[in-house]
Structures are given as C-alpha cells and as structure tokens.
C-alpha cells in the first residue's frame, strides 16, 4: 500500500490520505467574505481526493490582508459563508483546514494579475501597513508603522478570536502562518525586526510573538484537534532567519502543543537567491523532523506521485502539501491512486465512468 494514500492521524483526527491542499490566495473576496469562487475552488480539490483542504491565508484583522480581496475571519459575519464550504469538504470525506495570517508590512498590495508591484497607497484605496520595525519590504512597498506593545497584544488576541470563529465555521485544523515574510515571520527575522524591546534583538525575543500567538490559539482550539504552524526555514539571505533557528523554534512549538510544522522558505527579502528545483524545501522538513521530533509537511515543486511517495518512505516528511500542481490538476490525488496502486475506490460515483472500471456503484458512493 502506498504511504501517500494511507490514512494519517493527528490527535483524534484522521485524514483520508497524506495529501494536503496548500493554502493558495485567490484574491477574490469582498470584505473578507467567502463566495462561490472559494466554494468551487476548494470543493473541487476535495472532490479530487485530497485528504486535507486548506483555505488561503485568512486575515485575522482587516489591515492584515495581503490584498483588499483576501479572505478574512476578523468578524462574525465572515463565519457563515465559510460554513457551506466546510460542509461540502466534509461531505467529500476530506478535512477542512484554515490558515490564519497577518500580512504585516506586506499588506495592502495589488492583486498579482494586475501587473502592478508594491503597495496600494492610501489614495488608491489601500492602507498603511504595520510591522515589527519601520522597514519596507522593498522600495516599492510602503514603510510600515511599527507596532507598539499594546498593538502586539491586540494581534495575539485577533489570532485567538479568529481561531474560535474557525471552529464555529466548521474547520478541524488551524494553521498559524509564520512564513513567507508576513507579520509573524517579520518578527522572527533580523532582516525585518530591529526592535530593542522584548520582541526584538535576541533569538528569544524574536520568537516571542510566534510563541505567544501559538499559545493563545492552542488555548482556544480543542485539544482533540490538530494545530499546525507554517514556517520559512530560511530567509535565503546572509544574517537572516536560518535553519538552525527554525529547528529550535520547532522544539518550542512542539512543547506548546503544535502537531505539525508546515515547512516552506523565503519571503522576507526581495534579494533572496532561492535555488528552486524539485522538492527544494524538503531537506528542511527532514532536518526539522529529525532534530525536533515533530511531524512535518513539505511543499514546493512536488509534482509526481512517485516523488511524493519517496519523500514519505524515506521519512523526510509526514504530509505532502501540493499547490500549483493542484491548480493544474485538481484530480491529482485520484490519478496518484491509479499510479501508485491505491484503493481504487475514492473516485466519486458520479465520475466512475471516466475510470474505465466496470464495477457496480452503490448509492453510498454518491457524493453530496
């Protein structure tokens, strides 16, 4: 049996397989509300056989959105539109997960397909972003307002409040986004954090906010349900956040009740030279897994079922996160089932005629 296609359990939650839909921003919301696009986008990946379906980075405050069109969970009105999505995901046998995020200094930007770079200025309908220090991401981005300690406490509370709303919305996994150069990663990295208070300077100070956010979320998130944290293992820049620091952070997060580290990289520097290639981030997931004893997920240029299977069999990671490959082919998990000799029973009954299998279909196989 393929490891990729075997069920996988964390706490009291079992996933259909070890394939996760990585959070991918759709930039298609109004006022942070999920709509038909999000239902079809996420629902089709659930029909396609992935065991865990993550929403895009969902902002915990309005000013924490990457773009004005991002999903949000900073008010109660945003709960109900997400409920119909989680209901549909569960009906397909998948688990619904949500990534909670704050963009920090990388907030108030343009939707990527518009071809514009940098910040949306206030006079263009944007807002002034916030960050650990008044350091812009690059010359095209607005210099952020430095958060004071009271505002930092507000951010911590916003993550906890969003987690409570996520539970009401029907999600079973929460992931804290501390990667890709967004707010929590900005506090981790000396490239973006030059504070001189308890949140800056030393390693202990720079990890403080991530630990406090994680602790606040774990406190309100049910003990029987898993909590993930996404990290960038390295900034890919000299004197930036590095893999050794990530390993130590992972140990601290495990002690706080985190169940899996979702391992990515980069995002704090526009000048980073990233050696992108097949599975280029997997070695970080492996080193974190071995050194900290926590489960890891890996993402980035994983395109073939055999490649994913090899990663799992060689104990480099525990879950495979797929992103662009699932945009190209929402049914990648079902095709992987064919390629790797899986259970042969996860195609929806409504789609069985496409599988060239002459077998009876029971009413219980029909998807709602």
Name the predicted role of every residue range.
Residues 1-368:
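Flavin-dependent oxidoreductase catalytic cores
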